[in-house]
Amino acid sequence: MALRGQVLTPDDAGYADVRPAYNAMHPGSPAIVVVASGTADVIDAVNFAREHDLLVAVRGGGHSVAGLSSVDGGMLIDLAPMRGVDVDPEASIARVQGGALWGDVDRETQAFGLVAPGGVVSDTGVAGLALGGGEGWARRKYGLSCDNILSAQVVCADGKLRTASADTNSDLYWALRGGGGNFGVVTSLTFELHPMGPIVAFTGVFYPVADAAEVWRGFRDWSLTAPDEVSALCACTTLPAHDALPPEIHDTPFIVIGAVYSGDPDDGMKVMQPLRNLATPLVDISQPLPFVGVQAAFDPFFVRGTLRSYWKSMYINDITDDMIELLARKAAERPSMRTFAPITFLMGGAINRVDPEATAYSERSANYLLSIDGNWSDPAEDQKVISWVRDTWAEFAPYGTGGVYLNFRSLADESEDSDVENTFGDNMRRLSEVKAKYDPTNFFRRNNNITPTG
């Protein structure tokens, strides 16, 4: 391969620098790493891998908790140098390269008081998050990341670059919005932008774990009438000392409520005030803040490459009183300091106003998303934490809709977690047909895989 970017093997200087990924359990050991400088490099890499029968993993931001952004013994196509973000403020669109992080996008769009709905961690890759759904601080007002994709440039399994939009390859466009990395290497995405920021109302309040049931109940009750402008979450964890965190919570278990208002900051602080009075806080850092700062506020919770992680999720419609008691019990018995008792994301709003068949992402009725995030450091604790997450998920399963959020899916090859079909529901058949058209041999299978028909 004659590339403008780098080609690295395990014997090359620099290989060790690009090998690690988000989850320390899954660093991967690729035989070849292609550090792509542009679309031409991606095309050459795909053609080479196809001709030499190499299993391919694609890394945008490298934030896959399941380790899908690396591979053992195959080829890793690393898009890290491709981080360009072009904003057209008059048209309210942004063209984003496949290796960009959400922090890159926020910096460029916020210069114009605009936002592309992204995640809640600035270090997350844009493409991976958006292709799997994308649930961030603007989700209830402006929808998921995938709902705001206007077009994509995709290098497919045959090595051809295709544009996918509502008017061109519309079947591929439909599948990309929720179908993940099944259909090719996405080298760029064009997003619709919306007015938000540069200052937004932010709620960040930390309560004692002893008040978990009271706080979750208050969060539930408030969420029932919350306006679409508010996107919020409630969770329990413990964090070590960090300059970005208030000292009152260093090494102290807490329940945190995070919320952002997509509108006038003064109005937002009033609307979210009840979330600050659910119990006596350990500390309350709620205030109007720059949106770029809010996007980075949860970065210390999810530090790249330092933790071993195993997560499971589910969508639910209601938080019952019985479920609140279960949430509080799980908050008190977490198996490791950095494990999250279920993060409860408030969904609904604009998300649920999209027809389930309009995009591959089909969960359009749930009011909440639960994510049980096991995070730890010592490999000797692998089985303990993984078992706790699985058992906890099983206890909550009766409350679930049957679907999971695929971006929060771990160990994608384990049989008990093979829930892709349940998640896509009635869209699964159509996805398999699109897969057969653009990737009939399942060349791109290092993902939450969709099997091609035929």
Each model region followed by its residue ranges:
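Soluble FAD-dependent oxygen oxidases
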Residues: 1-454
